[in-house]
Amino acid sequence: MATFTPLNAASEDLDKEKRTLEIRIEEAVQIYQNALSAQKQGDDNAATKYYDELLNVRILRELPFTVNSNYKKNNALLLLHYLTRKNHGLFLLSKLQSLLSLDPSTDPIPVYRDALLDFAIALACDYNDIELWSFVAELAEKLEMPRIQRFALESSFYTGYEPFDAERVFTNIDDLNPGKLISLQNLYNLLKKLGGIAEPLPQLDLSISSLYTLPSFFPQLPTPSFHRRSINLCPKIKKLQLSHDTLHGFLDLVLYALQINEKKTPTRGFPSTLIIHVHSLNLSTAESHDLESTDSELWSEISDAGPDTNTINTAAKLSEPVYAKDIVPPPSDNLPKPQLLKRPIDDSDVRISKRSRGRDLRTPSESNLFSLIASITSDINEQIQKRFPDATSPFSGESMFREYSSIFEDYHQLLVNFPSEGSIPDLDVSTDSAANGAFSKMILIDLAMHSANRLEHMQVPDGYLLQLLSEVNSLNMVPAELATFFVESMLRPRKLEPPFYLQQCWGKIFKKKFTTICERIESTLHELVKASLQTPEVFNISQSLFELFLDDYFLALKFSSNDQKDDNVSEIPTESLEYKKLRCLRWKSLTEQVVELQPSCKSSSQRHLIIRNSWARNLLLRLTGCSSEAIVENFKQLRCLLQENSDSLELLNSQCMADLSVQVVDFELSKLQTVEFFNTLFMNTKNLDFNAVIKNLEPVLSPENKFAEDPQAKFISQFLEKTSTEFQIHLWYLLYQAYSSAHRPYNSLLCAFQSLKIILIRLCSSSFSIQDAGRRQAELLGMLNFSSNLFRIIWQKLHEQPDILSPCNEMTVIDCIRIILIYLRTFAIYVGIDEDISDQRIPKPSNPEFDSYAQTVKDSLMSGWCIFYTLFAHLLHYDFIKADAQKLLPQILTAIHSQYSFRGYCSSSNQSFLELSQTECQRLDAWENENEILQCVCCRFNLIIGSEYYVPQSHQSDSVNLTSNDAIKIIPFILGFAVKRSHGWVMPRSDQKNALEIICKVIRFPGENNADVYFNKCAIKEFLERDISPQLTKMLLKSNDILGLREIGSKVVDDRVRGLYYAQSQVLFGYYRSRLKGSRCINDLLVIIKYFLLDLYLNPRRQDSWYTCSSVFSSLADEELGWSAEQICLADDVINEYRRKAILCNLMALSLPFTQDKLFKANVYFDFAMNLYASARPPLEMAAFLPSETRVFSGASGLYNLSMKPIEVSKVIALAADYFGMSAELSNDWRALYMLGKACRKCGDMENALVHFEAAAALAPTKSGSGSQQALLIEPHYALLSNLSKAAIEGSVEIVQILSYLRRIRHPPKDSGSLLEVKNEDVNIYKRNALLFILKALAEMRILDKQSWHHRPTYRIAKIMEHLGNVQQAKEEMETLFSYKTSGKSLLNIWRTPNERPGRHFYYGATYSRYLLSLFYKTNDKVNFLQFLKRFRRSSSTIYEHRQIWLDIMIKYLEDLRLQHSVKETQINDLPLVEFKYVYKEISLLDEQKLSLLHQVYEIRKLNNGLYPTIKVDDFLIDCFMSLYNEVKSSISPLDANIPNSPSTITAKPLNDEKAINNENSVKQKTVITRKDVVSKVLALFRPHRETYYRETQNKILQKLASTSSSLVRSFTEDSSQAGESPGIHEEIQ
């Protein structure tokens, strides 16, 4: 056997993989050949063995046609599968034949199934093997699998891609070859056995047929006997359950059964073997059959595609009943009820209960809105009655609605008992029925009749459904028989009762489904009627079916002529209009045959049937276009027939022939005389000749026209008075469209109002009131639907054209208001019903269409109130009305809004009322109507913006996204009340901030493409990138326009948008100052900067924007400075950039002319001076003034760059002092005087500084802050005392003057007046007394500071004590500012004071630390010094320039150790390893006193932790170790230690011998020790395991370590004394 490479070999070559598959196929073929040889030789055992081995081969275990197959494209593999499976199946059958000859009791079924499986796999590989299909058919016949047998026989006719065509096979038998005739005979026998062939096959020549009769392939194989009945005697019984026990449920079940039958029945229309049994949970049948569905293999259950939209889902298990319902399953009592939103408390009282800033309180809302409006308009009502005494005023209250109480009662009952789904026959006709303005002949035929709308009424006698179910189950009907039985039961008379068709009123859905069933079994019904023409009941059935089909054809014609679609057309299979027409003609001829066979002596029921038939035939003639003469003749005959017996019929379920009476016939005859007029109208509308349409309709519709001269118009007008209301509305709508297209809006508006008036006249007519309740309520529902559409049309006109009412007179407006109020009063009934439903006092209607209808009513309510307001506002313009519109109109709007402030009523009708109310309130008086505007904005856009008097409430309205146009409209209002500015400070409200953020996002920047805006943008950006130079500062302070910024006019930017970005930035900045300050919200401040820059691009000369922008940049710098000391060092460039831009914005604000008051000017001066002073002082002193520009100069050696000269700090502080002084002159504020004194002190002018400090202390309040944040204000008082102590120590001011200042301080110490007495003593005594007085005053001030916030007095007390020689007390005072002795992590024990500049806190920490170190030296406090260092090392976040201070400590510390112990610098020169080991061992045995120096360096190395360069510490550590090393080595005898004399035993080699050099280096590395090894060995001496050895001597080591600190402290002191009292250590830093 050939060898092969497996697939998991190392190589990944595709050719090798392909070769591997070929080898496997070759091996399998070899096994297949061996199996065939064994089978040929008759060795069944060997063949079985080979076949088992073959089928277990890897490539044959996976079927080649599966999705996951890797070899499905290999033809050789497919052939191998095909041959193996086919021959294996034949081998199994052959082996079974041998076994049966030996043992006849062998069960053949398993072998048949295995062989059938093999044949199936073989056919999947090659489906063109006709012989193999015949094998499958014969095996399926033996197994009694008719479905498989039939499929195999049909497949033997057409293989490959040709589908089986039964019609072609059974009609073209002569074209079949002999091999297919046997299959045809077998298929015929099978279908005949199943009852699926209605007609026999065409006659064949039996002799020829016998020649082609082939014998059986397996004649000796037996057919097993199954223990079940024959298949043709065992149909499948389907048990279905009613969804609910009504005719609706039975109808759904019948329709569902037909759909199941259509899916299960083959395409040739073979009879169904599916028997339907109906079951109901609530109805107990007399003969209850607990039948199980048999497993039939002929038909499948349900198609895998699932049921369509008209079917229901069947249950998977037979034990579960099947609901035959195409809408929803039956409701369960345990289902949770939907939670409805209840109406909240009316918020009108809330709105009017707020303080109204002196405004009149609005009238509170009442329960009855119409009574409230009547009370508001009582004066207007009197004026109308006085002007028009005979007219009915629309504002007379409830008295106007009394005559319409019956309408209100009918509508209330209709809503309480809302019709179920589809229970109204037809409400599809609306004002939109004139599609494209065309007048259709179907509109004339349909709408000229009175409305046939009725509510569904389908009650059945008790026990009828139970009897119906029992009869159905006893007859064992198939779906078609069940459908026929149900149709007959609905159309056949019941003993002495008329049929349900005439007795019940069917809803639209029921009628459509019933018509669908009739269409599906029409041929059966036709044959049934045709077979029993003389039966009395057949006339009822045939005539009713004729009327149903005629009604269906009529509705189809109507919808096709109007280009409309019915809502439920998609649920029923549609047919062409021509087929519907032919069907009606077919049933017309059939009913004529029935009429001819009726007896001459006719009963009343037969006479009524003949009348119905005559009317239907006449209507069909009209629909098919018959001549008018024949139609008139038929109507005359029908009139005589009706007059003979005074008959009058009413067909409850017919749309096209609802009422049959003499009056209707007369009306139809008169209608035929108007055909010419309406044909002309039809052609004009079709040609879109609107002027001609107006000319046609104006004379017959307008009531003010005279008809004496035009008899045709008079006749048409009289005819229209007899027509239905729907038809009249249709004509008015045509006239409305014509007026609109002819650009006559006022006339079109009057047409819409006239339609509303016509509907109202119809609802108040006697003919409407005498109808039965069901028909009256159905028509009322349709009329109100008309009015809803008209409301939408009218409001659209009024909204789009505000001046459309200008030509309208007073009476027309009053009449329109009255009509609108009546409709609103009708629709308001729904509000009460909705209240009851939400409060669960009444149940919600089960009709799913109720929600959509409810939304329609809500839309009608709000659009109707918009129409009423518009008409009422126009009425106030007339001269005879004397009323204050600005006060009256907002009351109307507020009353309406408060009445509908629940469950989203106010947002209905596409938020038309909210938009109207908001717009009108802004137009009338935005300030007075602020609350209503806020509520409208909240309901429309979900923007909750509260004022100081009112916060809007949620009305559960559906909000919309805010658009740019909407935002622009509300910008002036929001900016008018929300932005209350006071020199940069804005009332911070989060809701206003969020609202303005949304508005700014919606409105795009208006000047993106304008050249002037772009110029301003570039100029401002370039200006903010400049350095601060003396020239620039001088030019800006002289108010020179150096930027040349351009003004942006109103043509480029809308004035309403111009202040938006300014207002938003002010609100955001105010929000930051009140809530976010100190939280390092950099991103929020950058957003504020963005809005300020956008405002400056549009308004470059707005001084307040430049000034506040400077404050924002300063806040950015403050946030970075106040976070941590480390952040100051990391973000120094960013902080300097913020400070530089803040100063530039200040300069730009100063360059613009001041237009505001002195206080604003003083604030600008003060902030500018503060920015200068803060930038010139630590931390980051003068960094903002460093120039980044360079100049290029030409020298002897070429061009070179020279940096610009920086500004001197003295000039910056002097400029700040000038502006502090100007701010103090304008505002007389203590802060300006306080900062002026500090600036003068830094400039060296102590005398003026003391003057300003004293003035600031006199003006300063006792406490700062407000509320619980109040704290004692001591800054100006401390500054005065501190500078007096400095002046006394320095001698810059005479002592007498100092004493004079001290006598005038606000908080003098107790019992210290003697210290200030002048007794001609020594000046030094006066100086000492002054310092003692200041000490006591500072101590008294510190006692007043109960919160211990202020730390500066403690520092100043320590400085004075040191000067007086009491260093120990000075140190104790300073130690209170630190917490290094406790176990906490923080070093500083000071707090940020309210008036402390950001960043100064960390600078004070550095100053205090340096000063405390010097005091430790002076007091020789070594232990506290070491503890302080340990805590100081971990305090980098609170100490400014922490690293630099630590470096200074380490440098002095190591130098002091080197000098104290005389440690020399040494170099390690290849110490021998043997020698080092011996000496190191001796060193490790030394006592702690000799190792104390190394231990001190080890401790400081651990404490340093890399902050100071570790290599320098290690160098000093090595120096200390080598000093000890040499000392120990010198005390050891070389002979005792066996130490070699030479440091290395490696002999020298020539330089050119590279191998020798490498050997020497390797040996050297093994015999010498390096510097790194020395450090590691020294550190090993003091590892944690040796800590127990030194625990007893720890105090001694600490003392030695502290003794070395004296040089360090001394160095600090010496540096300070040499440089004078430097500001970095000894001077107070403000």
From Swiss-Prot:
Q: Where are the TPR repeats?
A: 8-42, 1230-1263
Q: Name one GO biological process term.
A: chromosome segregation
Where is it located? Nucleus
Q: Identify one Gene Ontology CC term for this UniProt entry.
A: HIR complex
* Region listing for Disordered, in residue ranges: 325-347
InterPro entries recorded for this chain?
Hir3/CABIN1 (IPR033053), TPR-like_helical_dom_sf (IPR011990), TPR_rpt (IPR019734)
What are the UniProt keywords, alphabetically? Chromosome partition, Nucleus, Repeat, TPR repeat, Transcription, Transcription regulation
Outline the subunit composition.
Answer: Interacts with hip1 and slm9.
Q: How is this protein named in the record?
A: Histone transcription regulator 3 homolog
- The primary gene name is hip3
